[in-house]
Amino acid sequence: MAMSFEWPWQYRFPPFFTLQPNVDTRQKQLAAWCSLVLSFCRLHKQSSMTVMEAQESPLFNNVKLQRKLPVESIQIVLEELRKKGNLEWLDKNKSSFLIMWRRPEEWGKLIYQWVSRSGQNNSVFTLYELTSGEDTEEEEFHGLDEATLLRALQALQQEHKAEIITVSDGRGVKFF
């Protein structure tokens, strides 16, 4: 059941692909770009990307309008997402990044709610069971990439709700 993506009205507006010089207009434009990136990545369950992939993806490249957001502007949008806690650079050159349409704390909260709701406190899970197991198929965190999952579990560990452990076939987590 693939859902289609609903592009915002701005995406069909050519000036959207040029960052505006007016401070107020630019802030609204950056907010719209950030919202678009997060919605797009969430729908496509895309959690990491390079800047070059981003530039060529439909996200920043409207083929129909023949407009593309310049790479310098993409960097500004990505930096705005980083400031909001939704992006983490994966290298010093800032050429690849982890996109988090939910912050790690939010993922942790969702996972912990599922654990509590299903009566599985004091249980141990492998990372695979959490993101790929049959029990989590209906959960939003099903299919979550390992890097984001670990950040979510680290957030829970800081709240003393979980402990990341080593199990025979890799890493796991015990929930309290």
From Swiss-Prot:
Pfam family of the protein (one): ESCRT-II
GO molecular function terms attached to this record: protein homodimerization activity; structural molecule activity
Protein name: Vacuolar protein-sorting-associated protein 25
Species whose genome carries this gene: Rattus norvegicus
UniProt key word Nucleotide-binding: no
Matches recorded under InterPro entries: ESCRT-II_cplx_Vps25-sub, ESCRT-II_cplx_Vps25-sub_N, WH-like_DNA-bd_sf, WH_DNA-bd_sf
Predominant location: cytoplasm
Function: Component of the ESCRT-II complex (endosomal sorting complex required for transport II), which is required for multivesicular body (MVB) formation and sorting of endosomal cargo proteins into MVBs. The MVB pathway mediates delivery of transmembrane proteins into the lumen of the lysosome for degradation. The ESCRT-II complex is probably involved in the recruitment of the ESCRT-III complex. The ESCRT-II complex may also play a role in transcription regulation, possibly via its interaction with ELL.
CC per GO annotation: cytoplasm; cytosol; endosome membrane; ESCRT II complex; nucleus
Encoding gene (name): Vps25
Binding partners and assembly: Component of a complex at least composed of ELL, SNF8/EAP30, VPS25/EAP20 and VPS36/EAP45. Component of the endosomal sorting complex required for transport II (ESCRT-II), composed of SNF8, VPS36 and 2 copies of VPS25. Interacts with CFTR; the interaction requires misfolded CFTR. Interacts (via C-terminal half) with the ESCRT-III subunit CHMP6 (via N-terminal half).
